[in-house]
Amino acid sequence: MHAAEQHRPDVAEQRAHWHEQLAADPAARLVFVDESGANTKMTRLGGRAPVGERLVSQVPHGHYQTSTLIAAVRLAGACAPWLFEGAMDGELFLAWVRQGLVPTLQADDLVIMDNLATHKVAGVREAIESVGARLRYLPPYSPDFNPIENMWSKIKQRLRSLAPRTDEELLEAAADAFESVSPADCLGFFLHANYDI
């Protein structure tokens, strides 16, 4: 399933030429950015029980804390992971770019992110370009072009498995989940998004 807007002529045109436009950039130089939500009520979505027995699991339905995970992914692995309470805004995103992302960048890296308004606040491009890296935005309605979406799937599956119930447990579980992302995983994420390796 995908967004119907991908078939609008203007969006379809941008999507059709995306991979061609990146052909000159080695995959090892591509750095994809995104954020995702996590909370203290995450639990496995399925499980097993002995034949004839019902699977029973407990999930909190009361107060829980929602947090935002932000990171980048490149062929070598996940980088610059941050976790903070609440939703992303432009000020937090710029702080992450300056303090988390930029120290991991090298000259000629190409940072790619979606068109979220918080990704376009003043100072983001300047911070990235200050180290000789470049910035591009994905075509609209194109999460399938972002390998980090597959990384989030793996990380959330790990978080559900660990089932953190406090902020401290969520922080520890997030660290564990990011450490579980291997270069082999990242290769698969890039291939799944149709990038030439």
Regions found by a protein language model. Give the residues of each.
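Short functional hotspots at interaction and active-site rims
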Residues: M1-I197
